[in-house]
Amino acid sequence: LVYDNFDRETHVKPAPANAERVFVGLDDAGSSTTSIGLWFVIGNRKWKKREVYRAGMKNSEKMDTIQAWAREFDIEGVVVDSAAYAIKQDLMAAGFNVINSPKGTEEGIKIVRNELDPGPDGAPLILIDPACKRTIAELETYEYDPKTGKPVKANDHACDEMRYLVVHLATPVPRAFDLDGL
């Protein structure tokens, strides 16, 4: 398994009602399955609170989902599959802060695996609400192809969406050059 350190008992916990920061992750596979996740961030901990996981979603349906969440929560950004041009245009037109998904599947998987491990307080940095059933199912079945050693590109949409979000949050934001400090 790609995430063999995922354990239901450890990682599946009810999400809190509120968060310090709120993000949406989106793996948009066009006519294939789309995974949209509502993520709460508290300190360094990421908590997937809700999910929509469906094949054949129109962009208008994706937008309806994200806009409904935005009426409930102050969404800081939507981390989107970098290849999903059309939905990114719709999100920007609606005023959302659109963040391209980071590149590098293997490096991203390493980051997610590290954050599934126990943190300094003994708890993992990634938690999943029990309502996110598709994400849980994918985490328990996402595997490497024994012939290629690469992740199998099937039933991986929630895992990809999670990876985009987690890697974005794990990537330090470059600081502007400060001339006053010279």
Language model regions located:
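Mg2+-dependent endonuclease catalytic cores in nucleic-acid-processing enzymes, primarily RNase H-like
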Residues: 42-153, 172, 176-182
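Stable alpha-helical structural segments in soluble proteins, enriched in small hydrophobic residues
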Residues: 157-169
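ATPase catalytic-site recognition across NTP-hydrolyzing enzymes
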Residues: 1-26
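Alpha-helical architecture
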Residues: 25, 136, 154-158
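Residue-level detector of short, conserved catalytic/binding motifs and their immediate flanks
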Residues: 34, 76, 159
